[in-house]
UniProtKB/Swiss-Prot annotation:
SUPFAM superfamilies: Ribosomal protein S7 (SSF47973). The keyword tRNA-binding applies. GO terms for biological process: translation. The keyword rRNA-binding applies. It comes from Mycobacterium tuberculosis (strain CDC 1551 / Oshkosh). Pfam families: Ribosomal_S7 (PF00177). The lineage of its organism: Bacteria, Bacillati, Actinomycetota, Actinomycetes, Mycobacteriales. Signal peptide: none annotated. This is Small ribosomal subunit protein uS7. GO terms for molecular function: rRNA binding; structural constituent of ribosome; tRNA binding. Transmembrane segments: none annotated.
Length: 156
């Protein structure tokens, strides 16, 4: 096993249009096969649609959506004496943001709208209103953690 320790976190540059690191993270998560300009077009288009539909700042809408999707608890597998338990643990803030973005994009890709811009915009709007598949995923994660609360003493 390598002994160098974890790789250092690299600083994220602010997004050129909105000046937000959150938008930069979103662009990097939408990115597929190195096509960053396409990812930027999708994200900016989705944020513009969100602005048109709500009439508010799209970064605020995105933050509200992420707050509704971010998990506070998750379960992690822990093997104890031949049995594997699902142990509920708290989620670090950076991981909760990453998970929220991943779920938001994953469920927007599964939606039925015609373009990815529409899908992402509608998923962001749904999440900001407390609806949508990504919010349901968070609720399911919390339910799973609550159901396995008995194993919380196995935390590490």
């Amino acid at each position: 096993m390598p002994r160098k320790g974890p790789a250092p976190k690299r600083p994220l540059v602010n997004d050129p249009v909105y000046g937000s690191q959150l938008v930069t993270q979103l662009v990097n998560k939408v990115l597929l096969k190195g096509k960053k300009s396409l990812a930027e077009r999708i994200v900016y288009g989705a944020l513009e649609q969100a602005r048109d539909k709500t009439g508010t700042d799209p970064v605020i809408t995105l933050k509200r959506a992420l707050d509704n999707v971010k998990p506070a608890l998750e379960v992690r597998s822990r093997r104890v004496g031949g049995a594997t338990y699902q142990v509920p643990v708290e989620v670090r803030p950076d991981r909760s943001t990453t998970l929220a973005l991943r779920w938001l994009i994953g469920y927007s890709r599964q939606r039925r709208e015609k373009t990815m811009i529409e899908r992402l915009a509608n998923e962001i709007l749904d999440a900001s209103n407390g609806l949508g598949a990504s919010v349901k995923r968070r609720e399911d994660t919390h339910k799973m953690a609550e159901a396995n609360r008995a194993f919380a003493h196995y935390r590490w």
